[in-house]
């Protein structure tokens, strides 16, 4: 699918529309096999932007570093940092994904109340160009509200959320990433879920690739159940941690109540303390894989930096079709307008 076609999809409209990804579940594959099957293509890369968060050994955010404290490596080659901003004020586009599967029924009211407070704080304290889109997911994915700065509209949609069967977590990430990709500024996904995926056509690797193509940072908020289940499957938590680390975000595992509010507050603080690093790639060796490995270093051993681990750019060889943009079947989506 072309970028223009994706921009006109149901997931980019102002009305709520239910979208279903049309690939069979047999698409799921192991990580090694997935890496071998990534199509080769060439994409013009100009300025590559990297958002970085730095913490000290106590886990506290560090927001006063200088440009000279950072080093950026593209496929192992050090790059000149052309743009540097502390506490960047680039506009935010936040996709808030809320799990409304049956397993979240007991926690859903607490989650939506806390998410409402999060959105109020985010939109009242930040850039007036900041915008949030709201998605819910159970057996399919619903765009409850397209990108807006209107908190009241988002609050109304949040309070109307109801549960259903199934958890199409990876499909939700994939579709939200597609909607985030054309937007300017910083792009973030905040995912409120209890963990596991049960209904997606996409797998974790396709979801991560879509987020990386969109330059989106993923913050999973994995809500611990009110009644602890010793036998609960934690595979979904590991997958979400994998995606967070691959995009420069970090996972949160709160219980409902004050811990959930604190997790949302920490996300806002982190977003307001990010460094923006940007470079024009040069001398980075081209590879068969379009994925360029990124590494951001800070020249102080007591500090730890979080940033996305790569981006999709030029590859050795000819031109091809960007595979991540051709895998949506428009005829296979379920579309439903909300009254």
Q: Regions from the language model: what does each represent?
A:
Residues 6-7, 46:
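Hydrophobic residues within membrane-embedded alpha helices
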Residues 5, 12-15, 331-336:
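Short, low-complexity interaction segments enriched in Ser/Thr/Pro/Gly
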Residues 26-35:
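Hydrophobic h-region of N-terminal signal peptides that target proteins for export
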Residues 10, 17-20, 200, 336-337:
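Residue-level detector of intrinsically disordered/flexible regions characterized by low predicted structural confidence
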Residues 2-3, 9-12, 19-25:
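Short, low-complexity intrinsically disordered segments enriched in A/P/G/S/L with frequent Arg
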Residues 34-339:
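Scaffold/interface architecture of coatomer-like assemblies
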């Amino acid at each position: 699918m072309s970028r223009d076609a994706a921009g006109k999809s149901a997931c980019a409209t102002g009305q709520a529309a239910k979208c279903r990804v049309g690939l069979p579940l047999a698409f799921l594959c192991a990580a090694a096999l997935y890496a071998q099957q990534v199509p080769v293509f060439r994409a013009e890369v100009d300025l590559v932007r990297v958002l970085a968060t730095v913490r000290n050994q106590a886990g506290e955010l560090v927001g006063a570093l200088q440009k000279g404290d950072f080093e950026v490596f593209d496929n192992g080659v050090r790059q000149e940092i052309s743009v540097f901003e502390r506490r960047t004020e680039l506009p935010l586009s936040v996709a808030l994904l809320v799990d409304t599967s049956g397993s979240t029924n007991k926690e859903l009211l607490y989650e939506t109340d806390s998410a409402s407070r999060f959105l109020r704080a985010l939109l009242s304290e930040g850039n007036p160009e900041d915008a949030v889109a709201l998605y819910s997911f159970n057996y399919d994915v619903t765009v409850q509200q397209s990108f807006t700065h209107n908190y009241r509209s988002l609050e109304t949609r949040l309070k109307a959320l109801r549960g259903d069967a199934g958890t199409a977590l990876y499909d939700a990430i994939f579709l939200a990433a597609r909607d985030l990709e054309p937007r300017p500024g910083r792009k973030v996904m905040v995912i409120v879920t209890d963990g596991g995926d049960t209904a997606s056509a996409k797998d974790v690797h396709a979801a991560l690739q879509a987020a990386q193509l969109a330059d989106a940072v993923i913050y999973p908020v994995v809500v611990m159940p009110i009644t602890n289940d010793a036998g609960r499957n934690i595979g979904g938590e590991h997958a979400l941690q994998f995606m967070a680390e691959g995009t420069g975000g970090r996972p949160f595992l709160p219980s409902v109540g004050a811990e959930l509010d604190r997790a949302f507050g920490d996300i806002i603080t982190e977003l307001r303390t990010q460094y923006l690093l940007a470079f024009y790639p040069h001398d980075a060796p081209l590879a068969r894989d379009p994925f360029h490995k990124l590494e951001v270093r800070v020249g102080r051993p007591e500090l730890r930096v979080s940033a996305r681990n790569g981006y999709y750019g030029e590859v050795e060889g000819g031109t091809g079709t960007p595979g991540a943009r051709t895998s949506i079947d428009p005829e296979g989506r379920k579309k439903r307008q909300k009254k």
